[in-house]
Swiss-Prot record:
The keyword Cytoplasm does not apply. Component of the signal peptidase complex (SPC) composed of a catalytic subunit SEC11 and three accessory subunits SPC1, SPC2 and SPC3. The complex induces a local thinning of the ER membrane which is used to measure the length of the signal peptide (SP) h-region of protein substrates. This ensures the selectivity of the complex towards h-regions shorter than 18-20 amino acids. SPC associates with the translocon complex. The C-terminal short (CTS) helix is essential for catalytic activity. It may be accommodated as a transmembrane helix in the thinned membrane environment of the complex, similarly to the signal peptide in the complex substrates. The active site is at S53 (charge relay system), H92 (charge relay system), D152 (charge relay system). It comes from Coccidioides posadasii (strain C735) (Valley fever fungus). The gene is SEC11. This is Signal peptidase complex catalytic subunit SEC11. The chain crosses the membrane at residues 22-38. Residues 39-210 are lumenal. Keywords: Endoplasmic reticulum, Glycoprotein, Hydrolase, Membrane, Protease, Signal-anchor, Transmembrane, Transmembrane helix. The keyword RNA-binding does not apply. It is an enzyme of class 3 (hydrolase). NCBIfam families: sigpep_I_arch. SUPFAM superfamilies: LexA/Signal peptidase.
Amino acid sequence: MLAGLSPHLSNLRRSLTQVLNFALVLSTAFMMWKGLSIYTNSSSPIVVVLSGSMEPAFQRGDLLFLWNRSPRAEVGEIVVYNVRGKDIPIVHRVVRAFGDDEKSPKETNGQKKKKVMSSVKKDSIAAGALHSDSALVSHRILTKGDNNIADDTELYAQGQDYLDRKLDLVGSVRGYIPAVGYVTIMLSEHPWLKTVLLGIMGAMVILQRE
């Protein structure tokens, strides 16, 4: 009876080993991703170009490597940002930047800044006025795709005329590999390919067991 159980135990042991190896691969990949995310200070340190709006600089399917530890994004720099309320990364170039000592478009119109200054005057706190005013004017940028005619104002969230460096940017592009990410685009545009890949992986596992 023990002799009859031996093959079953051997198969079970082999199956468990394969499951553990697969889990080890997944956990290692996850740890590497989290480590890279912490190192670059970016929630998505690697992204895929999804459109042709940055041609000829970047083509659809290019794999981009991001860095998000710079305090500013300079004009001409290519950045990746998320539109507020959406989870779609957009890769575009900075065409205007408003530093801490500059006025953003809204402040030029004298709307938001006047409200803050009036409230500060009512409180009669001069020191607080300077601090509040400095904190208000954070580093803001305006972006545009190289292959687009207009800037990204229409892409931003409703009522948003610029991007906030700290709140909206995923990172700045520091390197890329051409066309490598096109597989991701194919899988998202053709869901049936995911089923095919899963079937191939399952077949490989079965063949290895035999």
